[in-house]
Design a protein with these regions (language model features):
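Bilayer-spanning, highly hydrophobic alpha-helical transmembrane segments
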Residues: 99-145
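Catalytic metal-binding core of the metallo-beta-lactamase
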Residues: 1-117
Length: 145
């Protein structure tokens, strides 16, 4: 299971804060591993640390897991690495995933009331008249369909 946008928002926010504070990417990853991260994030940081230990670039080390890191993320991290501005790159990713999580949450919240009305309409329009007429369930279901 891949990260949710909300999880990625928090993940990249923490990395951005640590890199901005002067931590190296390895130290930031190790410090984050000392906290209670979801297993998938911890695995990603361990793989990143192993990749960096093997001499890979930050982008290559992060991008090794195609299921967790998208092409967009790889490219933004790569641009930040090449430009020497990793903290802003991670913050851009955090902002992007924060906006995505907010948009998804707002869309789901916006659908709650119409779904309630739909179910209430089905109940009032089909089930109540059937039950009031003392019909059995088969007749009610036939009227519904």
């Amino acid at each position: 299971m891949a990260f949710t946008p909300a999880q990625k928002h928090l993940f990249y926010t923490e990395i951005a804060k640590m890199v901005e504070a002067g931590f190296g990417i390895r130290e930031a990853g190790r410090a984050m591993l000392d906290t209670r991260l979801p297993a998938r994030q911890a695995d990603l940081l361990r793989a990143m640390d192993a990749g960096l230990e093997a001499g890979k670039s930050i982008t290559e080390a992060f991008g090794a897991d195609d299921r967790s890191i998208t092409e967009l993320e790889r490219r933004i991290i790569g641009a930040g690495e090449r430009g020497g501005r990793l903290a802003p790159a991670f913050q851009h990713l955090a902002d992007y995933f924060g906006m995505l999580a907010t948009a998804r949450r707002d869309a789901l919240q916006s659908m709650a009331y119409p779904m309630l009305l739909l179910h209430l309409g089905l109940f009032v329009g089909v089930l109540v008249p059937g039950l009031m007429g003392q019909s059995d369930f088969i007749d009610i279901a036939k009227n519904f369909v």
